[in-house]
Amino acid sequence: MKNKFVELVEKSQLRNDLPEFNPGDSITVNLWIKEGDKQRIQAFKGFVLRKRNRGLHSAFTVRKMSSGMGVERTFQTHSPLIDSIIVEKRADVRRAKLYYMRGLTGKAARIKEKV
């Protein structure tokens, strides 16, 4: 049970401008990157490997293949560094956590698209 003051502060920090997405969906995460005194937006495109729903502490992991090597990045859902999330494709998967995809390559690593 959380303190009512903590709940009130956390509720004000939650973002409601992000789209709904699920594990397996192909998404593009546009996030702010700071290099020295400059800021720019960088896109990270891949599929959602897992999603953790914990209110303000929610997070999701996106996996992509870069030069034949798998790259995973975990994002805090309500982070101010995330500019936008674009859902490219919806997937039809039977698991909530797609850790088995780490060991698959080529055609075996394909995800069925939701019709």
UniProtKB/Swiss-Prot annotation:
One MF term in GO for this entry?
structural constituent of ribosome
What's the short name of a Pfam family annotated to this entry? Answer: Ribosomal_L19
Which UniProt keywords are given for this protein, alphabetically ordered? Ribonucleoprotein, Ribosomal protein
One biological process term from GO is: translation
* Lineage top rank: taxon: Bacteria
Q: Which Gene3D superfamilies match?
A: 2.30.30.790
Q: Which GO cellular component term is one of those annotated?
A: cytosolic large ribosomal subunit
UniProt family annotation: Belongs to the bacterial ribosomal protein bL19 family.
Please give the function described in this protein's UniProt entry: This protein is located at the 30S-50S ribosomal subunit interface and may play a role in the structure and function of the aminoacyl-tRNA binding site.
Stated name of the protein: Large ribosomal subunit protein bL19
Give the originating organism. Francisella tularensis subsp. holarctica (strain LVS)
